[in-house]
Amino acid sequence: MLIFSAYLRSIFGELMVKMKAMKKSKYTWLLDAGHGGMIDGEYQTAGKRSPAFEFGQYFEGVGNRIIVKNMLAQCKALGIDAIDIIDSDDDISLKERVKRANNLHAQKKNCIYVSIHSDAFSSPQANGYSIYTSVGNTASDAVAEAFLDTMKEYFPDHTLRHDNSDGDEDKEAHFYVLKYTSCPAILIENFFYTNPRECELLLDNAFQDRIASCHMDSIKRMER
């Protein structure tokens, strides 16, 4: 009887896990890895790479794809509705990315667009992370704040680059993918690949996993 009871508990536990995974998502997450990837050893985007440091060179579009693929795998495991906007190593145009996002939002009505990037500057001292939304007060602001709150928890020793002039910490810009998407949209700058210390971190598999897990925690919190 004890063995049978333990068996029933085990089956019930597995069923609850499966039912939780099957729970309908509140949102459809449109994940966009910025820039191009690597095809036959050739990087598909001009620029958008670190200097050739002694420890290696970072290609932004490649790193963005690693993070997005990690997030997509986690979403699938959790039953969260997520779509890879590009699903390619080609450098898809901004206009095409926005077109795909808007078509999906027109169908599903519940999309949130998340564009994954890392930052660059002429000075190697520039460092930290930031999140951008379109200009003005929009539904994107709350999404950005949710992601920033999680990033502050995960990366307390790194600089949050922010703009509090409008009462929140996200930065605002007329970036094409933020201005012309019809759903809430944010663009995340995951540190500076032109900064030697941060570039070395961005090349580290464990740090890439940490970035992906950080953004997934934001998604999971918004899905509750």
Task: Label the predicted regions.
Residues S25-Y27, A77-I83, Q107-I112, Y154-D157, ...:
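Loop/turn elements at helix/coil->beta-strand transitions in domains of secreted/extracellular proteins
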Residues Y27-L30, L104, Y113-D119, N164-R224:
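Active-site-adjacent mobile loop/cap segments within catalytic or ligand-binding domains
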Residues I39-F59, D119-Y154:
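A short, glycine/acidic-enriched catalytic loop
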Residues V98-K108:
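Short, well-structured alpha-helical segments in soluble
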Residues Y58-I66, D91-K95, N137-A142, L202-R210:
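Soluble non-cytosolic domains of exported or imported proteins
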Residues H35-M38, D87-I92, S118-S123, G136-A139, ...:
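Solvent-exposed loop/turn segments at secondary-structure junctions
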Residues V17-V98:
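Active-site histidine-acidic residue metal-binding/catalytic motifs
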Residues R65-V68, L72, K95-V98, G128, ...:
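Extracytoplasmic/secreted envelope proteins and their assembly/folding machinery
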